[in-house]
Amino acid sequence: MRQENDSLGIVEVPEDKLYGAQTARSQKYFSWAPEVMPKEVIRALVLIKQCAAKANHDLGFLDSKYCDMIVSAASEILEGGFEEHFPLKVWQTGSGTQSNMNVNEVIANLAIQRHGGVVGSKTPIHPNDHVNKSQSSNDVFPTAMHIAAVINLKKKLIPAMDHLQRALDAKVAEFRDCVKIGRTHLMDAVPMTLGQEFSGYSNQIRQSLERVAFSLTHMYELAIGGTAVGTGLNVPNGFIDKVIHYLRQETGEPFVAASNYFSALSNHDTLVNAHGVLATLACALTKIATDLSFLGSGPRCGLGELLFPENEPGSSIMPGKINPTQCEALQMVCAQVIGNNQAVIMGGSRGNFELNVMKPVIIYNFLQSVDILAGGMQAFADYFVSGLRVNKPRLKEYLDNSLMLVTALTPVLGYDKCSKMALKAFHDNINLKEACIQMGYLSAEEFDRLVVPESMVGKF
């Protein structure tokens, strides 16, 4: 162990770790849970430190030597391999201050180490005076939240959504001529094609994609420069433009300064709204996964309209059983995301005066939702949707036996006669054509001419 000092006194720090006193204190008091600060947030914090150093140097507030040391250390961390030096939990101060200081300390100590200095000496690089210069945890952490959210939505979630939509669209085309009976209220309805049914699923994903894209609009606004309460205290003129310029350069994303810094620090309505979009996507995916599970139920004693890909045995006791496991996994993902949404809402509601104090739990749940939705949709598309096949004999069986084909006769016979015909067919356990002939409404030839399921599927 080595000894370091902070404003409260001496702290023991593991000799082989690059973090310092404040991180060690946080570990002592907040080590009782497994959830660590997401690596995406740490990367965003490191990136902010790198860009802030460049901005401070450009404005003449940080010597070239110190800037180069900070930028070099940050670059090395961003390349990977330093995860053990960022051990702090999600459950910490609600401003994320401890993780901000964790990053400050690691960058400072790595820079010191690489230049032959003594780790923990704060010489020549100081975690507060140099790495955190022109910054506060209160503006840095929400900036990191937005950066991490934007990057993960665009690199993980949106590609996975697009992949699933394309898989569904392929089935729309493949099943376009497969006429089946639709269902409303879980009961038989009029004919449609299986392709039409899948087009509804595809459109749900398409609309969710549009909602996700729109939710990014305000997420590009960054709080950096607001410092402690949004007034920009201790921020030199030009710093905000400079640091955002470098963040745009490094990420390729169109980040801009917050339209109102008091809002950017005190609330996270933008992330609450965006996670609401993720919850909406989860609702859509639950509906799709549930429908497909039912459509393939059986295979002998269920609906059996779809045949599932045979990925793995489904039972430890019943041989030959194949279950819709990808559907079930996705449904569990969606349940978790909808639960996360409540946590994000609660976190967002805790904006006390000038600072929201549940920032870590908001971004933790947000990023978890993105990760599991992206992974779940990718697997669902690859291992389930793409392998679905249609059971055409079962579709024909249901078509031939459906009583709702009577709807095609209402323009000719009227609603009342058609109702009597359908009820007779049901109670006598005969098909619709037989009931129609027995009741003397139409001849067999007239019935066949008027009741053609393929002509009842509409134009869409």
Curated annotation (Swiss-Prot):
Gene Ontology MF, one: fumarate hydratase activity
Where does the source fall among the domains of life? Bacteria
Q: What is annotated as the active site?
A: H185, S315
Which residue positions does UniProt flag as site: Important for catalytic activity? E328
Annotated positions binding substrate: 95-97, 126-129, 136-138, 184, 316, 321-323
So what does this thing catalyse?
A: (S)-malate = fumarate + H2O
Per UniProt, subcellular location reads as: Cytoplasm
Q: How the protein assembles, per its UniProt entry?
A: Homotetramer.
Q: Anything else the record notes? A: There are 2 substrate-binding sites: the catalytic A site, and the non-catalytic B site that may play a role in the transfer of substrate or product between the active site and the solvent. Alternatively, the B site may bind allosteric effectors.
PANTHER family linked: ASPARTATEAMMONIA/ARGININOSUCCINATE/ADENYLOSUCCINATE LYASE, FUMARATE HYDRATASE, MITOCHONDRIAL
Q: What does this protein do?
A: Involved in the TCA cycle. Catalyzes the stereospecific interconversion of fumarate to L-malate.
Instruction: Please give the name of this protein.
Output: Fumarate hydratase class II
Q: Which organism is it from?
A: Chlamydia caviae (strain ATCC VR-813 / DSM 19441 / 03DC25 / GPIC) (Chlamydophila caviae)
